[in-house]
Swiss-Prot record:
<dbReference type="InterPro" id="IPR013507">
    <property type="entry name" value="DNA_mismatch_S5_2-like"/>
</dbReference>
<dbReference type="InterPro" id="IPR037198">
    <property type="entry name" value="MutL_C_sf"/>
</dbReference>
<dbReference type="Pfam" id="PF08676">
    <property type="entry name" value="MutL_C"/>
</dbReference>
<dbReference type="GO" id="GO:0032300">
    <property type="term" value="C:mismatch repair complex"/>
</dbReference>
<dbReference type="InterPro" id="IPR042121">
    <property type="entry name" value="MutL_C_regsub"/>
</dbReference>
<feature type="compositionally biased region" description="Low complexity">
    <location>
        <begin position="367"/>
        <end position="381"/>
    </location>
</feature>
<dbReference type="InterPro" id="IPR014762">
    <property type="entry name" value="DNA_mismatch_repair_CS"/>
</dbReference>
<dbReference type="GO" id="GO:0005524">
    <property type="term" value="F:ATP binding"/>
</dbReference>
<comment type="similarity">
    <text>Belongs to the DNA mismatch repair MutL/HexB family.</text>
</comment>
<dbReference type="InterPro" id="IPR002099">
    <property type="entry name" value="MutL/Mlh/PMS"/>
</dbReference>
<dbReference type="GO" id="GO:0006298">
    <property type="term" value="P:mismatch repair"/>
</dbReference>
<comment type="function">
    <text>This protein is involved in the repair of mismatches in DNA. It is required for dam-dependent methyl-directed DNA mismatch repair. May act as a 'molecular matchmaker', a protein that promotes the formation of a stable complex between two or more DNA-binding proteins in an ATP-dependent manner without itself being part of a final effector complex.</text>
</comment>
<dbReference type="Pfam" id="PF13589">
    <property type="entry name" value="HATPase_c_3"/>
</dbReference>
<keyword id="KW-0227">DNA damage</keyword>
<feature type="compositionally biased region" description="Gly residues">
    <location>
        <begin position="382"/>
        <end position="392"/>
    </location>
</feature>
<dbReference type="InterPro" id="IPR036890">
    <property type="entry name" value="HATPase_C_sf"/>
</dbReference>
<protein>
    <recommendedName>
        <fullName>DNA mismatch repair protein MutL</fullName>
    </recommendedName>
</protein>
Length: 618
């Protein structure tokens, strides 16, 4: 058989094999088109489980007459126009395949009118070449799609359809999922002329609770724990059922949405299951309704024919974020149980801490960098301080079990800061001849050394060594402990018996250094670290610190601070002039003894006299 171009109808029927699995698939695609059109009311009429009729009517923006024929063509869409649009898609549909595919396996009629048009127009495709016919019609502003005799021309597909009741149950489930995703839209579902479901648009929390109860049932509502969790561009909200009271009936309630799109994602399910594993039996599953919002550039929705799955660019970050959000609400279950009217508003923001594995590279700053980043802590007499990031609008969540009262007070103190941190106070440049000044930075040599001029002499200063001394000063407690910075996602590590014993022995000293942890039989969970360690890869640093402690017989805060200062990774592989000047200003302020008596390896005088002599000519 020679190579040939397939007829349009056959090509669309092949595509329909992926897009149109059953009547519920048709309903999903068409209702999502209505939502993309801005509809606030969608009526779904079904006959004989969708095999005879599927009618979707909405009050959206409608389709212009000249675009009706294109709407039924393959790969024609108003959702995207370039690859950039595809990589940051926010609409539910975008491929332009649904209407063409559905039209190829049914008798489809599209009727629409825009607000600018005086009359409506109707379009339908027929024949081998799928020629589109357009004619006038009567219709209000919006769109109606009628799908008659689904799979009438593909008997093999029609043979695999289930009973009328089964197919309608699948449609009912799709509408339930959409109703949970869009509380602001009225959805009416009818079957064989009878109204079966009516979900009115709601806005208030109490009304949302009633819709949640209508869809998921009263037992779920009674056990639901509200979640509101945020970190950078990630937001998690919704409800999870208390695992201690989860029944077999509740385990069927597993609804997850990514940027408003219904999902069945294994990564998300695994994170939720892992957070609940200590409270669930071997044969139990968590029950949840969760909404994940993420930067559209960081998620690929074009990885599944039916768009049931997505791929996250930073999957580990998303997994740990969801895990910690669910785990935190389970630990606070006595305070956050529904009904919603009886609980305090959930916090809109949480402190922006970095995850243990590193920084969030795609977080978009909400304000200028100088205002967003916490200022360098001011130290007086060796005592440390500093603030811990953005303010939580609703305050820090209730202390997790195992935390002591004073630890909760530290958390609250960290959050009682302005929503926008004040800009760091400018550090006055050091004056030449000052008794506590290294001098003036002339240039950077070799990427990690600063060439200094002071009192007529030239010296070379090692910036990594100066940074290490500064870290040690920042980590050494004075009259009060170093301020701890809570981690958004605590670091959980498996430890040996010797390592656990060493940690317990050094726990009070580590607390003075701002390192807070909890331990159980075989694991230790790092809950907070001092500010200088916020940007470090804690998954490497903390195990090395535990190994160091296990080898020691006695402990001292100075020795531990020295070890940490030597083993932290520099944030500046290549130093700039501005970074060097800022570092020296901090060192002069916090470590004045280094100016008076520089330790070995910090400063090296440069003898220019011999070089100058060589340049002199008789």
């Amino acid at each position: 058989m020679p190579i040939q171009v397939l007829p349009p109808q056959l090509a669309n029927q092949i595509a329909a094999g992926e897009v149109v699995e059953r009547p519920a698939s048709v309903v999903k695609e068409l209702v999502e088109n209505s939502l993309d059109a801005g509809a606030t009311r969608v009526d779904i009429d079904i006959e004989r489980g969708g095999a005879k009729l599927i009618r979707i009517r909405d009050n959206g923006c409608g389709i212009k007459k000249e675009e009706l024929a294109l709407a039924l063509a393959r790969h024609a869409t108003s959702k995207i126009a370039s690859l950039d649009d595809l990589e940051a898609i926010i609409s539910l549909g975008f491929r332009g395949e649904a209407l063409a595919s559905i039209s190829s396996v049914s008798r489809l009629t599209l009727t629409s009118r825009t607000a600018e048009q005086a009359e409506a127009w109707q379009a339908y495709a027929e024949g081998r070449d799928m020629d589109v016919t357009v004619k006038p019609a009567a219709h209000p502003v919006g769109t109606t799609l009628e799908v008659l005799d689904l799979f009438y021309n593909t008997p093999a597909r029609r043979k695999f359809m289930r009973t009328e009741k089964t197919e309608f149950n699948h449609i009912d489930e799709i509408i339930r999922r959409i109703a949970l995703a869009r509380f602001d839209v009225t959805l009416n579902l009818s079957h064989n002329g009878k109204l079966v479901r009516q979900y009115r648009a709601v806005a208030k929390d109490g009304q949302k609770e009633r819709r949640l109860g209508a869809i998921c049932g009263t037992p779920f509502l009674e056990q639901a724990l509200a979640i509101e969790w945020q970190h950078g561009d990630l937001t998690l909200r919704g409800w999870v059922a208390d695992p201690n009271h989860t029944t077999t009936a509740l385990t069927e309630i597993q609804y997850c949405y990514v940027n408003g799109r219904m999902m069945r994602d294994r990564l998300i399910n695994h994170a939720i299951r892992q957070a609940c594993e200590d409270k669930l039996g071997a044969d139990q599953q968590p029950a949840f309704v969760l909404y994940l919002e993420i930067d559209p550039h960081q998620v690929d929705v074009n990885v599944h024919p039916a768009k049931h799955e997505v791929r996250f660019h930073q999957s580990r970050l998303v997994h740990d974020f969801i895990y910690q959000g669910v785990l935190s609400v389970l630990q606070q279950q006595t305070e956050t149980t529904l009904p919603l009217e009886e609980i305090a508003p959930a916090p809109r923001h949480v402190p922006e801490n970095r995850i243990a594995a590193g920084r969030n590279h795609f977080a978009v700053p909400a304000e200028p960098t100088a205002a967003r980043e916490p200022a360098t802590p001011r130290y007086s007499g060796g005592a440390s301080g500093g603030n811990g990031g953005r303010q939580s609008a609703g305050g820090w969540p209730h202390a997790q079990p195992g935390y002591q009262k004073q630890q909760g007070e530290v958390y609250r103190a960290l959050l009682q800061t302005p929503a926008t941190s004040p800009a760091p106070e400018p550090v006055a440049p050091a004056l030449d001849g000052h008794s506590q000044s290294f001098g003036r930075v002339l240039t950077i040599v070799g990427g990690d050394c600063a060439l200094l001029e002071h009192a007529g002499t030239i010296q070379l200063l090692s910036l990594p060594v100066a940074e290490r001394w500064l870290r040690q000063a920042q980590l050494t407690p004075g009259q009060s402990p170093v301020c701890a910075q809570p981690l958004l996602i605590p670091l959980r590590l498996k430890v040996s018996a010797d390592e656990k014993a060493a940690l317990q022995k050094a726990q009070s000293l580590l607390g003075e250094l701002g390192i807070e942890f909890q331990s159980d039989a075989q694991h230790v969970t790092i809950r907070a670290v001092p500010l200088p360690l916020r940007q470090q890869n804690l998954q490497i640093l903390i195990p090395e610190l535990i190994g160091y402690l296990a080898q020691q017989t006695t402990f001292a805060t100075v020795n531990i601070a020295q070890w940490i200062a030597r083993n932290v990774q520099s944030e500046h592989p290549q130093w700039s002039m501005a970074q060097a000047i800022s570092l020296l200003a901090d060192v002069e302020r916090l470590c004045p003894q280094l100016v008076k008596a520089p330790p070995g390896g910090l400063l090296q005088p440069v003898d220019l006299h011999s070089a100058m002599s060589a340049l002199k000519h008789e």
